[in-house]
């Protein structure tokens, strides 16, 4: 259904509050288009017409999580709810409300206030990384296979990593092992935590997620601090022939902390380190 160079209208049909500032938005595709047709880890662009310009933002859907391929095996009992072909897709978006210090997130506030039944436009896919399942990736047109996958994610950068995790763990034929670092300010900022916890619990050891908080309260029993070399080495798979790393998060965290630590450990950009 998606087209890279043509905007297509979709209708907002549901908005569900997940936390004080996070919503799950369900959009309905045009009547004759049941499939979104997005590759795992890819993004859609949302476009909203302002008076003098078009506001555009990219998001990775949190549904569908599996391609429309009825012959594939799934380890999930609610297969239809996560598989493409329903005529809808879901975005999980954190709303950055305006304050005295900053104007807030333009698109997230538009979505938060948009009436149910109103239309917005989408196009895509964007993103050069596609997870094909069972460790196979197509990255900028080149094929890669990784048996072990490391993810370094921050804030809303969790969403492409979540789509990869879901695809790998919902497919009963996929044997890929995944280690993830998910960095946030506080516990309430962790997107999709319940879903990640459920995937980890049901993974039989294939998935391990390390949440690290920079502004945790006394009740937080997990990892505290920032992403650094020690955390990366303690939480992720070490460099190896079939080990890849995928990154998505704030530029400061990625450029100043994660990438230097990964390089020093022995990983190489565009060989086994990639950004969503």
Segments from the language model and where they lie:
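Reductase modules of NAD(P)H-dependent flavoproteins
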Residues: 176-276
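Conserved beta-strand elements of the Class I
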Residues: 148-152, 246
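Conserved S-adenosyl-L-methionine
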Residues: 146, 169-178
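Short, Lys/Arg- and Gly-enriched loop/turn segments at beta-strand edges
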Residues: 52-60, 127-136
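Short, conserved phosphate/pyrophosphate- and ester-handling motifs at nucleotide-, phospho-/glycolipid
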Residues: 41, 157, 250
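Hydrophobic/small residue at the entry helix of a nucleotide-binding pocket
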Residues: 156-161, 254
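Histidine-anchored nucleotide/phosphate-binding helix
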Residues: 160-172
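Ferredoxin-reductase
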Residues: 2-118, 184-186, 214-215
């Amino acid at each position: 259904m998606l087209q890279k160079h043509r905007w297509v209208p979709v209708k907002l049909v549901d908005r569900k509050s997940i936390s004080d500032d996070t919503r799950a938005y369900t959009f309905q595709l045009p009547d004759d288009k049941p499939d979104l047709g997005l590759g795992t880890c890819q993004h859609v662009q949302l476009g909203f017409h302002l008076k003098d310009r078009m506001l555009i933002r990219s998001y990775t859907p949190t549904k569908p999580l599996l391609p429309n391929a009825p012959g594939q095996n799934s380890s999930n009992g609610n297969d239809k709810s996560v598989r493409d072909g329903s005529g809808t897709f879901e975005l999980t978006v954190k709303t950055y409300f305006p304050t005295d210090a900053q104007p807030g997130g333009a698109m997230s506030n538009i979505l938060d206030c948009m009436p149910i039944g109103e239309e917005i436009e989408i196009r895509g896919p964007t993103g050069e990384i596609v997870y094909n399942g069972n460790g196979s990736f197509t990255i900028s047109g080149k094929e890669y296979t990784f048996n072990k996958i490391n993810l370094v994610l921050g804030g809303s950068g969790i969403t492409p990593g979540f789509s990869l995790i879901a695809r790998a763990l919902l497919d009963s034929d996929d044997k890929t092992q995944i280690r993830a670092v998910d960095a946030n300010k506080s516990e309430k900022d962790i997107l999709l935590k319940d879903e990640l916890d459920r995937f980890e619990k049901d993974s039989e050891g294939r998935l391990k997620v390390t949440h690290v908080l920079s502004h945790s309260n006394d009740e937080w029993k997990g990892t505290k601090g920032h992403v650094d070399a020690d955390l990366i080495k303690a939480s992720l798979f070490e460099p190896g022939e079939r080990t890849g790393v995928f990154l998505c998060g704030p530029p400061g965290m990625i450029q100043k902390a994660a990438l230097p630590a990964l390089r020093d450990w022995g990983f190489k950009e565009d060989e086994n380190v990639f950004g969503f």
